């Protein structure tokens, strides 16, 4: 289903790409794989940015390897029109019981009760992503209703707020 999903977005993106140097925005879970891994799916997404001659903003899970564990994040990636990575935003304000389990450290047994629930790590802050000389404030899902997030992006010179959601 992963390649089929990318094929759908490829068709939609290439038929609607208005001109070079535009921005194409996909939803929160548009890339249902770890985009940061070098494989055929990553190449397919990069090719869409190149062939559309547009910047591409999309959601994909991501991870960071640490010595003794791996952290997972709900992320947005921004590709330049040449397919290179401009930046990544990791969602800061996570949804309880959907993206993390509250009080897990105090009550370890909760993890067994809610097996299968996401256990994402929160991002480090609201830092704009840059494409050319433009600064985008990216919000994922219900972060779009948080006025503090929008204010923080504005304080950091974001010119456009983009909310990706499913």
Task: Kindly give the residue locations of the regions a language model identified.
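Enzyme catalytic cores with a strong preference for nitrogen-chemistry domains
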Residues: 1-166
């Amino acid at each position: 289903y992963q390649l089929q999903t990318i094929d759908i977005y490829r068709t939609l993106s290439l038929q609607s790409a208005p001109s070079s140097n535009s921005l194409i925005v996909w939803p929160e879970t548009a890339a249902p794989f770890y985009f940061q891994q070098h494989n055929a799916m990553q190449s397919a997404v990069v090719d869409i940015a190149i062939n559309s001659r547009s910047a591409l903003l999309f959601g994909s899970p991501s991870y960071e390897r640490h010595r003794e564990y791996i952290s997972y994040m709900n992320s947005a990636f921004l590709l330049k029109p040449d397919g290179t990575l401009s930046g990544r935003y990791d969602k800061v304000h996570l949804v309880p019981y959907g993206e993390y389990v509250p009080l897990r450290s105090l009550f370890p047994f909760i993890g067994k009760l809610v097996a299968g629930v996401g256990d994402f790590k929160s991002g480090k802050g609201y830092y704009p992503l840059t494409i050319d000389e433009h600064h985008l404030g990216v919000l994922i899902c219900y972060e779009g209703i948080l006025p503090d997030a929008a204010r923080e992006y504005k304080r950091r010179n974001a010119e456009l707020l983009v909310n990706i959601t499913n």
